[in-house]
Amino acid sequence: MGEVLIRMENISKEFPGVKALKNVNFEIKKGEVHALVGENGAGKSTLIKILSGVYSKDSGKIYFDGREVEINSPKEAQQLGISVIHQELNLCLHLTVAQNIFLGREFVKNGVIDEKKQNEEAKKILEKLNVNIDPAEYVKNLSVSRQQMVEIAKAISMEAKVIIMDEPTSAISEKETEELFKVIGELKKQGKSIIYISHRLEELNRIVDRVTVLRDGEHIITANFRDLTIDDIIRYMVGRKLEEKYPRVYVNRGKKILEVHGLSQGTRLKDISFDLYEGEILGFAGLVGAGRTEVARAIFGADKFDKGEILINGKKVEINSPIDAIKNGLAYVPEDRKLTGLALNLSVLANITLATMDNVVNMLSVINSVKERKIGEKIIRDLKIKTPSLFQRVQNLSGGNQQKVIVGRWLLREPQIYIFDEPTRGIDVGAKIEIYNILNNLKQEGKGIIVISSELPEIMGITDRVVVMCEGRITAILETSKTTQEEIMYYATLYKKERSN
């Protein structure tokens, strides 16, 4: 690591009703991978948005390569050499890899874009990263991890000195994560600085040099990563020692409430059969693309299936739409809460009552605002949703609080069966435990809960049984207390192994 490249001193930022940052200090050295961690709402995003020119600071100073600078726009940040790779990737899917890399800076010859030259230059950048991607391939045909590589190549093409990566591994597999870490290693060798934001603390020791912890808008500590344990970091993040990472409750399971028999859907799902009991958390494990989300969407009526049957409380039901599923006592919390789970421009209150409007309108279909408000206040209180007010736009909440809003919406309908798809993706360790406690409360109430998760420690920590999938098939249904992560991974790759043999 070299000398300090960026130094932020006493940075403060206030929004209506919220002090987002309070005299925060942060620095990154040349050729350093520096982790920025903290609970949702700690101030990480605000600090990064100030550094990348999205927000202006209220007070404080920023130094770049020894000189004080003002960063008033994303363009000014780019001119300094600061690039951001967001969790939601910023690519044009209908353009090629090369076209995305040089978008707005095309190679032009005789008034026409020189595609050949553009592809050649893109290939050079990708080779520099040791990444094998065809520059002429359309981005829409690439996996999320490959699209990330295109974003990194784009940053390099703009001569980025600092690359900010926001939750880069949240939607990619373990193998793809390894590839990303190799690329980060290459960037480090080239003297690039990486600010790495992640809630997956266990992965940081593989790439990170130093770590800075924020809590409630304040700088808590900056230290060499090797001098801290994961438990130390968690304690600095939440301000207390967490006794249990995966709180568990034991309940005598009740009757069988859901049966799925022979569910098939083209080539995506093949003969899916399983059951779910009252007071049970049933996990679904498997690699990316195994078909877990497809099962959830089929059961909930979001996607059609070709054959098979669904029984609830022993009776066959026809579920052809989400409305049918809701009428039959099912709730679904999707993996992409921002895209399909929330109305981001609406208030917290509107999102909570979205699925139960019949409870808050009178005979003239006019909303009873007093009744609606009481319902919203109860959900916020019961689930400990952190929000300045009921009328705050839900897009301004942290990931963990957004997730609680979706859960609260379904609680009002009192469903019998809950399906959670990646319920803790992109949320911090403290918020994760709050989500686990909500699941445990539902379990104690005798609800049946399906949890789809790509994090095996989470599957092992909170479920009673686990359904393992590979390539659209169920390869095993295991008692969680009697299995291991290694056995789950064996069954998660079973058909891949057979094919390779």
Swiss-Prot record:
Q: Name the reaction it catalyses.
A: D-ribose(out) + ATP + H2O = D-ribose(in) + ADP + phosphate + H(+); D-galactose(out) + ATP + H2O = D-galactose(in) + ADP + phosphate + H(+)
**How is this protein positioned relative to the membrane?**
Peripheral membrane protein
Cellular compartment(s): Cell membrane
Q: Does the keyword Repeat apply?
A: yes
**GO cellular component entries:** plasma membrane
Annotated GO molecular function terms are: ABC-type D-ribose transporter activity; ATP binding; ATP hydrolysis activity
Q: What is its main location?
A: membrane
Q: Which residues form the ABC transporter domain?
A: 6-241, 252-496
Annotated residues that bind ATP are located at G38, E39, N40, G41, A42, G43, K44, S45
In short, the EC number is: 7.5.2.11, 7.5.2.7
Concerning SMART domains, the annotation shows: AAA
InterPro entries of this UniProt entry? AAA+_ATPase, ABC_carbohydrate_import_ATPase, ABC_transporter-like_ATP-bd, ABC_transporter-like_CS, P-loop_NTPase
A Pfam family it matches? ABC_tran
The highest taxon in the source lineage is: Bacteria
TM segment ranges: none
Keywords in alphabetical order: ATP-binding, Cell membrane, Membrane, Nucleotide-binding, Repeat, Sugar transport, Translocase, Transport
The family assignment reads: Belongs to the ABC transporter superfamily. Carbohydrate importer 2 (CUT2) (TC 3.A.1.2) family.
Q: What does this protein do?
A: Part of an ABC transporter complex involved in carbohydrate import. Could be involved in ribose, galactose and/or methyl galactoside import. Responsible for energy coupling to the transport system.
Q: What is this protein called?
A: Putative ribose/galactose/methyl galactoside import ATP-binding protein
Q: Which organism is it from?
A: Caldanaerobacter subterraneus subsp. tengcongensis (strain DSM 15242 / JCM 11007 / NBRC 100824 / MB4)
